[in-house]
Structure formats: C-alpha cells, structure tokens
C-alpha cells in the first residue's frame, strides 16, 4: 500500500506538470531518487506521462558545475568526447558565456541550470540548431509553463521523485 501511495503521488505530480505545459516540452525526472527506490520511482514518472532520459550516471557523461569548478569547461567537454565510446554527453551550463565557449563541440545535450527565463530563451535559440536542450533547477508547477515556452526540449524536475507527496490510500478488509 505504501508503494502504491508513493507511485501515485509521483505519477500525479508528473501528470500535473504535463497538463500545465501541454506538448511544448517533455517532463523528465532526474537521478535524484530515494535510495533503493529508483526503479519504482522512475516507473511512476512514466505512469504519469513523463520520461526517463537518464537512469543513472553510467548512462551518459554528465558534466556538471562541480566538474567545471575544477577545470576549464571546453577542455572537460573535449576530454569527454575523446572517451565517450558511443555514450551521450550532457553539459550543464548556468550562463550564456559557458554555452558560447562550447558551441560547435560534438556533444549531445545542453542542460541549462537555474537560468532566468530570458537567458534560457536566448540559450535555447543559440543551442537548438546543434543540440538537444534541457532546463533544470527550481522548476515548479508555477513556472513550468514559462520554461516550456522558451522552446526547450526537456524539462527535468527533481522534485517529482525526491519531494512528491504520497497519495492517501487506505485498505479496508
């Protein structure tokens, strides 16, 4: 019963986001799941109409802000390209200068993290010709439609899995 409550809460939260944006973008979950419940939580996202584009960090290279803090973004992307062995490469950027520094390199997806709607729209315009685009960071039911209207391909929402409220079910015998 607890699993059904959890799955229903995740599926409902996912579906509410999808209803808010229509078909403008895909709603995705992130890797941020409850330990040992990843499979069931990602299944619940699918039940709600969302997608799972990354199951875990072994699925693709994900270059994030903590990697960037220790090195040059362009060099990190170039190294990932050398070792990708058929895997996708997603590069997180949190400003337009970072994006501009890697345009033209052979990676798959730009992940715009915590960007303003204005900058997200500009970033999507710059990247859409070459890469898949994904928005992430502080996305809620209140702002998801504005994010979708930027033209981004995917919107990843960590709170779908790590903060969804379980539905209230009871079992009577």
Q: PLM ranges: what are they?
A:
Residues 1-105, 109, 118-126, 130-135, ...:
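Acidic/glycine-rich phosphate/pyrophosphate-binding loops and surrounding catalytic core
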Residues 141:
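Cys/His-rich Zn2+-binding cysteine-cluster or related metal-binding knuckle/ribbon modules and their
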Residues 170-173:
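Active-site loop ensemble at the mouth of alpha/beta enzyme cores that anchors a bound cofactor
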Residues 114, 137, 159:
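Short secondary-structure boundary segments
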């Amino acid at each position: 019963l607890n699993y059904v409550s959890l799955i229903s809460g995740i599926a409902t939260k996912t579906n509410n986001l999808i209803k808010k944006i229509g078909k403008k973008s895909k709603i995705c979950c992130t890797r941020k799941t409850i330990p040992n419940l990843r499979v069931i939580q990602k299944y619940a996202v699918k039940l709600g109409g969302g997608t799972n584009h990354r199951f875990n960090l072994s699925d693709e290279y994900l270059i994030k802000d903590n990697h960037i803090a220790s090195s040059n973004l362009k060099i990190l992307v170039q190294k990932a390209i050398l070792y990708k062995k058929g895997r996708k490469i997603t590069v997180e950027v949190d400003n337009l200068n970072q994006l501009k520094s890697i345009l033209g390199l052979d990676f798959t997806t730009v992940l715009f993290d915590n960007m303003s709607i204005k900058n997200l729209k500009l970033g999507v315009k710059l990247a859409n010709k070459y890469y898949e685009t994904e928005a992430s960071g502080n996305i809620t039911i209140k702002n998801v439609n504005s994010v979708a209207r930027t033209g981004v391909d995917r919107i990843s929402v960590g709170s779908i899995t790590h903060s969804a409220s379980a539905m209230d079910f009871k079992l009577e015998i």
